[in-house]
């Protein structure tokens, strides 16, 4: 895989995400992009910020995850916004408190633009790969997204991944077999803290 995001940029984004959350929890204000932001991070890209509780099994660790699937903001700005939203606006969880940040690991996933999976619906499992792709399912007003790391953490195969993304969208788990359902795939470069406030590493999926 050809990496677009350098390791030092990934480290920059994870540290920025943590600072954005902690400053917002202290002041209620969104921080400005730092003056030393690498110019490449002003390119518009999709990004998600995930907060995981430290030393907890992956299936129960999630504390918040929100982002932008499509490149609508410069990456540095999108990371700040997604970080804050993941901490205080994820409807699945109560807002994060400042003291929790000592026990949360920050993860940033930089996304490629979503690509529509063409062809007959029954061929969709063969056109995706667990450990590489994330998925977006859309039908009517419903949509759902799962990042590439999710099926790896849960041990799903391709069909299970499709079914779970349908479920995330609020649709029946077999909706991926419907021609009216659009399925998109994307890849992500993922960076995470090894432990809260710790060193930052690129996260391999397989």
UniProtKB/Swiss-Prot annotation:
Gene3D superfamilies, per database record: Hypothetical protein ph0010, domain 1, Hypothetical protein ph0010, domain 2
Pfam families in the record: AMMECR1 (PF01871)
Taxonomic superkingdom: Archaea
Domain AMMECR1: 8-202
UniProt xrefs under HAMAP family: AMMECR1 (MF_00645)
Entry protein name: Protein PH0010
Organism field: Pyrococcus horikoshii (strain ATCC 700860 / DSM 12428 / JCM 9974 / NBRC 100139 / OT-3)
């Amino acid at each position: 895989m050809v990496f677009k995001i350098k390791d030092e940029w990934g480290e920059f984004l994870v540290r920025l995400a943590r600072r954005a959350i902690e400053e917002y929890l202290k002041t209620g204000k969104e921080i400005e992009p730092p003056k030393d932001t690498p110019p490449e991070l002003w390119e518009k890209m999709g990004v998600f910020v995930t907060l995981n509780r430290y030393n907890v099994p992956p299936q129960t660790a999630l504390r918040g995850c929100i982002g932008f699937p499509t490149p609508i903001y410069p990456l540095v700005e999108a990371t700040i916004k997604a970080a804050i939203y993941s901490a205080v606006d994820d409807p699945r969880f109560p807002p994060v408190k400042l003291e929790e940040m000592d026990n949360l690991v920050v993860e940033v996933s930089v996304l490629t633009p979503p690509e529509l999976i063409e062809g007959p619906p029954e061929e969709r499992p063969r056109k995706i790969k667990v450990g590489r792709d994330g998925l977006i399912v859309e039908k009517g007003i419903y949509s759902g997204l799962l990042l590439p790391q999710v099926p790896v953490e849960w041990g799903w195969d391709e069909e299970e991944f499709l079914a779970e993304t349908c479920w995330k969208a609020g649709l029946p788990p077999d909706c991926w077999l419907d021609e009216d359902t659009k399925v998109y795939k994307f890849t992500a470069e993922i960076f995470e803290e090894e432990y809260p406030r710790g060193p930052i590493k690129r996260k391999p999926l397989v």
